[in-house]
Amino acid sequence: MSPKVIAICLVALLLPISISHGGRIGPIEPSKASSKVVERGNYDGRVEGCEEDDCLVERLLVAHLDYIYTQGKHN
């Protein structure tokens, strides 16, 4: 076989392996995991000690989850 065919076969074999390895999500380190828990009904939209972007993300996440979990009550 020519070197070009061998190289193409090698790339074709290694590419799926590298793609699947790159897509894996490893365990989250406990120091990086957020331990904030928002009780339903007790959230007033403010998060202490966060920057503007972090607060926006937090509020959007809570609003989205509230929207998801209240859909069954309206149908």
UniProtKB/Swiss-Prot annotation:
InterPro entries in alphabetical order: Phytosulfokine
Signal sequence interval, chain numbering: 1-22
Keyword annotations: Developmental protein, Differentiation, Growth factor, Secreted, Signal, Sulfation
Record's subcellular location: Secreted
GO cellular component: extracellular region
Sulfotyrosine: residues carrying this PTM: 67, 69
Propeptide: 23-66, 72-75
PTM comment text: Sulfation is important for activity and for the binding to a putative membrane receptor. PSK-alpha is produced by endopeptidase digestion. PSK-beta is produced from PSK-alpha by exopeptidase digestion.
Database matches in Pfam families: PSK (PF06404)
The keyword GTP-binding is annotated on this UniProt entry: no
Superkingdom field: Eukaryota
Disulphide bond pairs: none
GO biological process: cell differentiation; cell population proliferation
GO MF annotations, alphabetized: growth factor activity
Family, as annotated: Belongs to the phytosulfokine family.
Free-text function comment from the UniProt entry: Promotes plant cell differentiation, organogenesis and somatic embryogenesis as well as cell proliferation.
Full protein name: Phytosulfokines 3
Gene name of this polypeptide: PSK3
